């Protein structure tokens, strides 16, 4: 006996469990606070278009630049720090083309670049910076953020 199309058992679809969306406006201050607590000098990097008091449009900042710029101290007996560019995104956010270009330019210039979307990403970034500090002080455990800079 042949089954008709409607009689066949259809495979059940798995429902995606929706993760709670974390907005960039929550990620950014948490990232700044974590970097500051870790000893970094932190600056919120604003960019965009402003309307002046006289009505003129004024473009500020570099297009695609990271949300946070920071200097993370390494302390090698002299005042030495790592320059960081941190892009904060919502939990589902992605880098735009101009942000990818900025990331490439920052890495080429010797900066460390991180994309942060959650508390886990913030913790991983701080851990990576601590590994960089230890490596620069003589540890054999080179962190990924520095390995990316050293590759030809």
Label for each model-derived stretch:
Residues 1-152:
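Catalytic phosphate/metal-binding cores of nucleic-acid and nucleotide-processing enzymes, i.e., regions
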């Amino acid at each position: 006996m042949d089954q008709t199309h409607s009689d066949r058992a259809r495979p059940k679809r798995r429902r995606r469990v929706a993760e709670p969306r974390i907005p960039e406006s929550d990620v950014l201050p948490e990232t700044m606070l974590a970097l500051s607590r870790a000893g970094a000098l932190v600056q919120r990097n604003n960019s965009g278009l402003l309307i002046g008091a006289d009505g003129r449009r004024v473009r500020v900042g570099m297009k695609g630049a990271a949300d946070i710029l920071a200097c993370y101290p390494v302390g090698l007996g002299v005042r030495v720090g790592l320059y960081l560019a941190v892009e904060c995104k919502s939990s589902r956010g992605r880098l735009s083309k101009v942000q990818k270009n900025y990331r490439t330019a920052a890495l080429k210039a010797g900066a460390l670049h991180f994309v942060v979307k959650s508390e886990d990403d913030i913790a991983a970034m701080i851990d990576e910076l601590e590994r960089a500090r230890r490596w620069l002080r003589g540890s054999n455990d080179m962190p990924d953020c520095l390995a990316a800079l050293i590759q030809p």
